[in-house]
């Protein structure tokens, strides 16, 4: 039996069918000939699809593919994947795109048993995903030969497997944080996204404003041995590399760390299968400060504030001159710093001192700018009618190479009253016969360092000179030291009066020629003694002079029974062969705590009980070469426990501690409530000696307003330059300008918060006459209606519905005398005509679109029904008389968002 020929419609019908089928082109499924066949397989011949087949395939077409949402690129937040692995979803082959042929039917010629490669041969799972194993090869489908000589057809049942996966949020790993306070937590290590990588490598970058640092506190820390957390400070600027603050082994819960810059990095690494619960860290910004400037040798420094804007003022001891800037300012920056290098204090070699009242002459440092050979001459001149008293505070001269001469007068020819080559050092000092003294120092390469300190003071001729006691204090009954005045002497800790015992007072006698009835005593460091004060100092014999050989001194230190002794070695420089021994107990028979020889750096020693014994031994005989300066040891009693004393929180504030117990290294951070400022250091540290680094601060209510500032083209007057509560600031403008705003601002207090000004700072604007309101047009309105408009202000006009605006929509007030509008106000006229293009709006537009579309659809359905009847087939192609040989084709979408889903079967016959 031959195959009947296919009937074709006439040309006019074909033309109509082509025009009507254009609307279906976009939604047609792919044909089987677009799929790539398996290499080596036979390429089938596919017959051209007629209109019925195209319409049938479109009716069974699936919905659009669901792809990645916009902005779901996981790269900014996910951890870095291992080398060679990518997190981007691979593109799908054309044959696997949803909706591209879930059902294909075609006329199969005789002898063709296959329609192309099977679905498992075309669908390949993307890398890194798992998919069900492909089914076995499909059996060849024999052609069906219906009775009655009908056309041979092929029926296919396609099984579509849809894989569905719940899309999880990406793991927040790499992150830049700029808030002033918050929390940093480890990523959710149990999520699918984090398990898809072999190594989790996260960096959290926290940065705040310049001038602020970052303080972190570890609240939770539970990491496995394979996990690592690094805390780094700095970075982010050229030449500023991050500096490691701590790692996992150094961190603990409750620990507080501070970054000295405005940037801090947290670097976290975790294996593919983490075992710990991660970390939680609280961070907050704090105000950075400049470091405390170093105190110059022979001088001191006073600091108003270490925060930006604070000042450091330097000054030198008497007899020294300041070299450098006297005042430095703390400047704000990534790391606040002072405006310059700290100055130094140097002693000058010679000079003239006019109108001398009280001061010192000090020898220059050995080996300085003056070199080893010195020739220094000083002239000290007091006011008319006064004389000078010169006290020898410290003198150490080389007998062979140094010489000191003092003359009573102001020239080298004045009479000599002291010569070091011939006279001993006068204990009572020297008194000039005139109003001047001439001091000359000669030194030629001395074997020992030169030490010289002379104190001078001027006094009236009708009274005694003011007494002086080095390393001690003087109290008197008459500050003017007239005849009859008494002066009483006492020594500083570590010194004792010499000669010892009473009398420790002298009297000014003889009204005709006033003088003291006895010499001033001296305070000298003694060799040994018993000390039972809570705090004190132990000095080497004759300190600050060099000790002499043949010393064997023993000091006993005793404090309360429940205390122990902290000994701090400030200076230790003894000769070779000399030794200082410390015994942990009462007497030299106790356990040896330490033996100190030669030069030693600063160190601290702690006794186990309330007693400590010190023994210094210097063998007799000529001293070894070199000068033994001696030693200075400070001691004080401390508690026996290992914690610093408890400090209460400040009133109107609070404090936070880095540790629960106040152990060594604990940091206390103080803060005040709004409206209060902190007086003192905001950070206290428990030091090694179990004392706090500074006194606890206090919170003081802020009673001043911030400086409101000046105004342009004007000036101000303030009732108080400090702007306290209740003060006033009055503003005035220059001629030609007018004040906009309140002329007087008042600083008033608030219960909560800092004091505030009563109003904003005014402005000075050019003085012009305002423009009058031009009026509202009939059938219209204007915005911002008011009677007067200042120069530069604009006014907009609008018309009601049904009216059109004739003229300028916006007019502006132009400054002048008088000010004028840029144009006349517009008019609102009735709309005469309507634009035809605007009639097609709303429902009319929808009707214009939907009516032709509906006609096309109805016409297409009619053509389809007509064509179906013409071919003699049922309307929908269903037939109960056919037998089927189902072919199951399984498609596996290679989209990583889907896995393990549902299965659908479609059974179609044409």
From Swiss-Prot:
Gene null: resulting phenotype: Mice lacking Sez6, Sez6l1, Sez6l2 exhibit motor discordination, and PCs are ofen innervated by multiple climbing fibers with different neuronal origins in the cerebellum.
Known function: May contribute to specialized endoplasmic reticulum functions in neurons.
Signal peptide: 1-27
Topological region Cytoplasmic: 866-910
The keyword Cell cycle is assigned to this record: no
Intervals, Extracellular compartment: 28-844
Keyword Magnesium belongs to the record: no
Name of the molecule in the record: Seizure 6-like protein 2
Compartment list: Cell membrane; Endoplasmic reticulum membrane
Domain named CUB: residues: 173-286, 349-459, 527-638
């Amino acid at each position: 039996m031959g195959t009947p020929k296919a009937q074709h419609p006439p040309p006019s019908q074909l033309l109509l069918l082509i025009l009507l089928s254009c609307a279906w082109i976009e939604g047609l499924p792919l044909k089987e000939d677009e799929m790539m066949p398996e290499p080596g397989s036979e390429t089938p011949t596919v017959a051209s699809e007629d209109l019925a087949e195209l319409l049938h395939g479109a009716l069974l077409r699936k919905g659009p593919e669901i792809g990645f949402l916009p902005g779901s690129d996981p790269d900014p937040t996910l951890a870095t994947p291992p080398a060679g692995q990518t997190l981007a979803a691979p593109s799908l082959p054309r044959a696997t795109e949803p909706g591209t042929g879930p059902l294909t039917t075609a006329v199969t010629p005789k002898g063709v048993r296959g329609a192309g490669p099977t679905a498992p041969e075309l669908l390949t799972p993307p890398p890194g995903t798992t998919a069900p194993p492909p089914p076995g090869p499909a059996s060849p489908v024999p052609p069906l030969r219906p009775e009655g000589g009908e056309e041979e057809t092929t029926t296919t049942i396609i099984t579509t497997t849809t894989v569905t996966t719940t899309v999880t949020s990406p793991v927040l790993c790499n992150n830049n944080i700029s808030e002033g306070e918050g929390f940093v937590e480890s990523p959710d290590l149990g999520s699918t996204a984090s398990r898809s990588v072999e190594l989790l490598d996260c960096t959290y970058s926290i940065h705040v404003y310049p001038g602020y640092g970052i303080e972190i506190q570890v609240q939770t820390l539970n990491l496995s041995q394979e996990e690592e957390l690094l805390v780094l400070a700095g970075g982010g600027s050229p030449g500023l590399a991050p500096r490691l603050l701590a790692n996992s082994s150094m961190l603990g819960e409750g620990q507080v760390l501070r970054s000295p810059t405005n940037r801090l990095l947290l670097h976290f690494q975790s294996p593919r299968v983490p075992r710990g619960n991660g970390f939680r860290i609280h961070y907050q910004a704090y105000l950075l400060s400049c470091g405390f400037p170093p105190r110059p040798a022979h001088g001191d420094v006073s600091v108003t504030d270490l925060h930006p804007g604070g000042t450091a003022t330097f000054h030198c001891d008497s007899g020294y001159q300041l070299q450098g800037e006297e005042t430095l300012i703390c400047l704000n920056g990534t790391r606040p710093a002072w405006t310059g290098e700290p100055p130094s204090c140097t002693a000058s070699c010679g000079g003239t001192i006019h109108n001398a009242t009280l001061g010192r002459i000090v020898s220059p440092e050995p080996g300085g700018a003056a070199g080893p050979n010195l020739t220094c001459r000083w002239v000290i001149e007091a006011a008319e009618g006064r004389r000078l008293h010169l006290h020898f505070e410290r003198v150490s001269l080389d007998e062979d190479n140094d010489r000191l001469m003092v003359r009573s007068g102001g020239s080298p020819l004045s009479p000599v009253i002291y010569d070091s080559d011939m006279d001993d050092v006068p204990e009572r000092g020297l008194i000039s016969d005139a109003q001047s003294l001439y001091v000359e120092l000669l030194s030629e390469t001395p074997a020992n360092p030169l030490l010289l300190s002379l104190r001078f003071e001027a006094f009236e001729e009708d009274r005694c000179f003011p007494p002086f006691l080095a390393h001690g204090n003087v109290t008197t009954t008459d500050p003017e030291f007239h005849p009859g005045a008494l002066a009483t002497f006492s020594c500083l800790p570590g010194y004792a009066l010499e000669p010892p015992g009473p009398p420790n007072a002298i009297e000014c006698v003889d009204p005709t020629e006033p003088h003291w009835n006895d010499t001033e005593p001296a305070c000298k460091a003694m060799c040994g003694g018993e000390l039972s004060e809570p705090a004190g100092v132990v000095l080497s014999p004759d300190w600050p002079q060099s000790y002499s050989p043949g010393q064997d001194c023993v000091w006993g230190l005793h404090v309360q029974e429940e205390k122990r002794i902290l000994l701090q070695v400030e200076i230790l420089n003894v000769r070779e062969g000399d030794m200082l021994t410390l015994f942990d107990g009462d007497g030299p028979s106790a356990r040896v705590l330490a033996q100190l020889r030669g030069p030693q750096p600063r160190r601290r020693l702690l006794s186990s009980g309330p007693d400590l014994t010190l023994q210094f031994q210097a063998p007799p005989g000529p001293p070894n070469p070199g000068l033994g300066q001696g030693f200075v040891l400070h001691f004080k009693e401390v508690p026996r426990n290992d914690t610093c004393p408890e400090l209460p929180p400040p009133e109107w504030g609070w404090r936070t501690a880095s540790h629960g117990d106040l152990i060594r290294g604990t940091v206390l951070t103080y803060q005040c409530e709004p409206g209060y400022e902190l007086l003192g250091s905001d950070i206290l540290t428990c030091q090694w000696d179990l004392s706090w680094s500074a006194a606890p601060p206090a919170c003081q209510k802020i009673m001043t307003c911030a400086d409101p500032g000046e105004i342009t083209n004007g000036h101000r007057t303030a009732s108080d330059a400090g702007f306290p509560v209740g003060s006033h600031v009055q503003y005035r403008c220059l001629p030609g300008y007018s004040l906009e705003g309140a002329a007087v601002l008042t600083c008033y207090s608030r219960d909560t918060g800092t004091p505030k000004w009563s109003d904003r700072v005014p402005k000075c604007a050019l003085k012009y006459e305002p423009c009058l309101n031009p009026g509202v047009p009939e059938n219209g309105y204007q915005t911002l209606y008011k009677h007067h408009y200042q120069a530069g202000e604009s006014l907009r006009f609008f018309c009601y519905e049904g009216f059109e605006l004739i003229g300028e929509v916006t007019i502006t007030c132009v400054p002048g005398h008088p000010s004028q509008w840029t144009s006349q106000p517009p008019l609102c006229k009735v709309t005469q005509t309507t634009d035809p293009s605007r009639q097609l709006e709303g429902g009319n537009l929808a009707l214009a679109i939907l009516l032709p579309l509906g006609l096309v659809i109805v016409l297409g359905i009619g053509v389809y029904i007509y064509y179906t009847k013409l071919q003699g087939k049922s309307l929908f192609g269903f037939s109960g008389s056919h037998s089927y040989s189902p072919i199951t084709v399984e498609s596996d979408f290679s989209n990583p968002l889907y896995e393990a889903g549902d299965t659908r079967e479609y059974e179609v016959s044409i």
